[in-house]
Amino acid sequence: MTQLDTTTLPDLSAIAGLRARLKQWVRTTPVFDKTDFEPVPGTAVNFKLELLQASGTFKARGAFSNLLALDDDQRAAGVTCVSAGNHAVGVAYAAMRLGIPAKVVMIKTASPARVALCRQYGAEVVLAENGQTAFDTVHRIESEEGRFFVHPFNGYRTVLGTATLGHEWLEQAGALDAVIVPIGGGGLMAGVSTAVKLLAPQCQVIGVEPEGADAMHRSFETGGPVKMGSMQSIADSLMAPHTEQYSYELCRRNVDRLVKVSDDELRAAMRLLFDQLKLATEPACATATAALVGGLKAELAGKRVGVLLCGTNTDAATFARHLGLG
């Protein structure tokens, strides 16, 4: 089985080096400054539009980071991964671009749009009953078929990939007083927060989780990785069944605070992003916005705040249903 690297930490040289290598494979996604975002007048909001990334989310960065590091034998054997949807899409996309066979394990409740994207990109899809069963299945595939396991939110290569997002964002945006970033298993936040603190130690890093899937909150409270039981949230792509040591440690080191948002706040933020920015987002993508206009509104008033829009792998019917239109 793949041994996750728990000793190496991303530094600016490694992050910049990977950014250069990824240029032909992933997009440099734009930022958009909005000084008249209606619910937070006087706050300058810098939106990072990672929802325009190849494969629809930030996950492509970690996927390419892992796959580009494989040797010829590993490429020939193929890759596997486990995901509620977006990581599987990212791995399937990267594997297609690099000519590597992919078998992805997804939870059976995954969005049909995400399952269809994986198949469109040429991956074999295996559906599992729940998150823990999915992890058990992917480790069996890894062991029996010799495929390389691309972890969805842990390990040096995955986190180095997401660190390129933070590096790119601050280069584009310039000085920010704070950044707000969604958290599921912690891989996105581990990378982004590492890059932000290396480049701008004074910038406040705030993580956001759904109330019904707060694995990192629980990890911070207990002082280490946790396993989750039953979870409930419309932000299905943030419902990690557990946290892992590597990504937890980086979040613990670099994240200044965590907040939670409710499903109703997510729905309101989705509508807000559609009404004011004309963006159709999945619930996970709206978490940072929900926090900005909710619990963080007074604290961040008058400041320049970065808001990460991390992905939008949804479909029209699901989007309409969340907004009460379907």
UniProtKB/Swiss-Prot annotation:
Pfam families, alphabetized: PALP
Gene Ontology biological process terms from the UniProt entry: isoleucine biosynthetic process; L-serine catabolic process; threonine catabolic process
pH curve summary: Optimum pH is 7.5.
EC code(s) of this entry: 4.2.1.-
Keywords on record: Lyase, Pyridoxal phosphate
GO molecular function: L-serine ammonia-lyase activity; lyase activity; threonine deaminase activity
Subunit structure and binding partners: Monomer.
Cross-referenced CDD domains: Thr-dehyd
UniProt key word Lyase: yes
Name used for this protein in its record: Phenylserine dehydratase
